[in-house]
Amino acid sequence: MIFSPAWRGRRYAVLGLARSGVASVRALLPGGADVVAWDADATRRAALAGAGVTFADPETIDLNGFDALVVSPGVPLNRHPVAAQARAADVPIIGDIELFAQARASLPAAKVVGVTGTNGKSTTTALVHHILRSAGIPSLMGGNIGLPILAQEPLPEGGVYVLELSSYQIDLTEKLDCEVAVLLNITPDHLDRYNNFAGYAASKARLFTMQTEGHVAVIGIGDTASAEIARSLPPERVTKIAAAGLDQSRWPALQGPHNAQNALAAIATCEVLGVSAEAIEAGLASFTGLPHRMERVGERSGVVFVNDSKATNPESVAPALAAFDRVHWIVGGKAKGGDLEACRPQFGHVVRAYTIGDATAAFAGLLRADMPVEEAHTLAAAVASAARQARPGDTVLLSPACASFDQFRDFEQRGDTFRSLVEALA
């Protein structure tokens, strides 16, 4: 567990006791902090019974005198009443990543890589972590992926913490000084949490304002917003990446143009960290990828089935379509927006689309002029139909361009269901 003696005698209110929240509480207590915590779920509160926590809803108590309000990234700061209450009391609103940043001074000297972007950050984070470990460098992966960072054991001196950071997590962080900060791309997403797209982009850019002199920014310049951020920084700090003409043939789990950008970002990051070219190449070749991200889950009669359930917006689907010549595309769920225009340049790769979930009818209407469409409604029906119609050499691709919560708990359950359906095919 990571904690800091700097928290001794301080008072913290913690709202939300899911993964990052409970990790924050369990780190603050041995640090000597006084903790008031709350979650509407009684079972989550019960899990901390006897730990020395006072249970009270921060909305119902006077926050004056607290040193910080710690919230999970899922709390919408633009509309949750507790945010206004904390600001009125001049209490900082932070998350577990900020607590980690505060704890660094008491930990063995190690570097931090922060990876953000609308798409690709999980793969890039995992890839950097894999290359470092393959090269013999102690590394931990956390943030928006894997175990909460505070729940992990500190690295020895010379190690590297590799953190996937959503815009929400950056919003809750003030002092995370990354030796390498990575921005892959910025496309419209999560706009319900920001006043406009510019606000969303500004959130991503804050990762670089927290860096001190001599630390490096690795930025993909394939979109306007990211390129503008790169231009705003001192040129000597910035390594720009653009995915074009990269030979990915030696890296089986890193196919497609989106993975070219992920690979370039990882290469640039590991070069800054002093990893040899030979070790980087070996790590790229041995990387096996992440579940639900262009994950090959089976082959039946020459037809490959690919689980890309993590692709929850059109911008992340487009490179998946581009990666295969003949695609039976399973698309739909709870749509985040009203169009699929970001995918249009790759429509020529699609043999047939199978629409599912709440977006079944709407997406069928959008696609029917460009390709054959079947309104499958359910994932099971889509997999069965695609398996019947696909021929050897085709790819059945689940890349939904939508959130999952109309029919599934999360994108992981949707991807696991797809895998099970493929495994059950005769």
Label every PLM stretch briefly.
Residues 340-394:
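C-terminal helical cap/extension that packs against the catalytic core
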Residues 33-40, 217-221, 330-331, 348-359:
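Short internal beta-strands
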Residues 16, 28, 69, 115, ...:
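Residue-level signal for inorganic ion chemistry
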Residues 1-99:
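N-terminal leader/targeting and accessory segments in enzymes
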Residues 11, 33-34, 138, 159, ...:
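Residues at the starts of beta-strands that form the adenosine-phosphate
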Residues 62-64, 73, 77-221, 225-234, ...:
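Phosphate-binding loop of NTP-binding sites
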Residues 2-12, 21-31, 250-350, 365:
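Nucleotide phosphate-binding/pyrophosphate-handling subdomain across enzymes
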Residues 34-39, 140-141, 162, 240, ...:
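Short beta-strand "acidic-cap" motif of Rossmann-like dinucleotide-binding folds
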